[in-house]
Regions:
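Paired small-residue
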Residues: 81-88, 96-104, 293-301
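Helix-breaking motifs and short loop linkers at transmembrane-helix boundaries and internal kinks
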Residues: 38, 70, 91-97, 108, ...
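Cytoplasmic helix-loop-helix junction between adjacent transmembrane helices
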Residues: 101-139
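Helix-loop-helix hairpin linking two adjacent transmembrane segments in secondary transporters
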Residues: 97, 125-182, 225-229
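A late C-terminal transmembrane helix in Major Facilitator Superfamily
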Residues: 319-357, 364
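Conserved MFS/SLC helix-loop-helix module at the cytosolic interface between two early adjacent transmembrane helices
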Residues: 57-93
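Helix-to-loop junctions at the C-terminal end of transmembrane segments
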Residues: 58-70, 255-267, 352
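Intracellular juxtamembrane helix-capping segments at the cytosolic ends
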Residues: 111-124, 308-322
């Protein structure tokens, strides 16, 4: 690839980093936000659930509304609005205002994750598309390694509001860099609701969406409450919790590497193995909580498998849909994935409040194995 291709991909990596950091940084700040606003775990967990449900509801309609817009211009609009809503989060003096700002961020998220992968594969030569997708995933991995833990460190030392302001500042920088380095990416034409039946009739797409819902719900039953789990069940210190979250995210690099090396050889087997690993890691959360080292190993494998799964499913959708429907197909994927995030956070919160936080791994594992059986029995021969 040429230098211009690399610089363009870096702009997408930066964007992925800030969007992913913003999406998940509340997970590392839940305890502080809960304490300040005097909320229960289930109530503060709604900060994650509502965000995810907004993305679920708005991904498709918003993407259809902007489907005719040139993608570079659209990306800059998204970054500008994203920055403004981060500042609003910083200024929030009530849980309601914070929730409203997060809903605004969720609206930009709804479109961002629908276009980021299609843009990545369009700005590079065809033979480098897997690398382009891996670069996008790298932004997500760095967010898990540095973004969320660093946001948590900032929150612990100078308050959770400064975490959101820091994201806003980096977002403003990313806006400027993207304006300079991302080339014009023409729209491939508008997409109307009338075309949805044809999209949904494409081979394997409905089953892929059902599978995505099951896996994402299972994953976020556990992951949404990983910070209080590590503190209350594993009795880790604040510094160890931060380290565990960094290792979780860092393992995503291995997941990205595994995807680039093995996914194209056998898509069915690759997805089967990574989902199996995710379910096993959820199952082992509580049994290994007596040992910090064992639990961190489980978190590392879990993070690796989760990243590999995410990029594999995005690649799968690009492969099984037509070029003109890819962005809308990705918007539906994003919406369904976020339905899983919201549902997982909701069910996990109910388990924390009405049973015990130590059970979240078991609940996630049960649903994860159900998803795995669905994949093997219903989708394995069709995807």
């Amino acid at each position: 690839m040429s230098l211009s291709h690399w610089l363009s991909l870096i702009s997408l990596t930066f964007s992925t980093f800030i969007f992913n950091t913003s999406e998940f940084v509340p997970i590392g700040l839940l305890t502080d936000i809960q304490t300040e606003f005097h909320l229960t775990k289930a109530s503060v967990g709604m900060l994650i659930s509502v965000y995810a449900w907004v993305v679920m509801l708005l991904s498709l309609p918003l993407m259809i509304m902007v489907s005719k817009m040139e993608m570079r211009r659209l990306m800059l609009w998204l970054l500008g609005l994203f920055t403004a809503f981060q500042v609003m989060s910083f200024l929030s003096d009530s849980f309601g205002m914070l929730m409203l700002s997060r809903i605004g961020v969720a609206c930009t998220h709804s479109i961002f994750w629908s276009i980021i992968s299609p843009i990545a594969v369009r700005i590079v030569p065809e033979k480098h598309r897997s690398l382009a997708l891996s670069m996008v995933v790298t932004g997500s991995s760095v967010a898990m390694i540095l973004g969320m833990p660093l946001g948590r460190i900032i929150g612990l030392h100078v308050g959770w509001r400064m975490t959101f302001l820091s994201i806003g500042i980096f977002s403003a920088f990313t806006f400027c860099y993207t304006a300079l380095k991302l080339p014009i990416v023409p729209s491939r034409g508008g997409f109307s609701v009338r075309k949805l039946p044809a999209l949904l009739n494409q081979k394997g797409i409905i089953g892929t969406y059902i599978f995505t819902l099951l896996v994402s719900t299972a994953y976020y039953i556990g992951y949404s409450y990983i910070e209080p789990f590590l503190k209350q069940v594993a009795h880790m210190s604040d510094s160890l919790v931060t380290a565990a979250l960094m290792i979780f995210g860092g393992a995503g690099f291995l997941g990205s590497l595994a995807f680039s090396r093995y996914y194209s050889r056998n898509r069915k087997a690759f997805i089967t193995w990574v989902v199996a690993l995710m379910a096993v890691c959820l199952l082992l959360l509580t049994p290994t909580s007596f040992s910090t080292s064992l639990l961190i190993v489980v978190c590392a494998v879990w993070g690796m498998a989760a990243t590999a799964y995410n990029v594999a499913m995005q690649s799968n959708i690009i492969l099984i849909t037509t070029p003109e429907s890819t962005s809308v197909a990705m918007s539906i994927f994003s919406g369904i994935f976020n339905l899983g995030i919201g549902s997982g956070a909701f069910f996990g919160g109910q388990i924390c409040d009405h049973a015990d936080i130590s059970y979240i791994g078991y609940a996630g594992a049960i649903l994860g194995f159900i998803a795995l059986l669905y994949w093997i029995k219903r989708l394995g021969t069709r995807v």
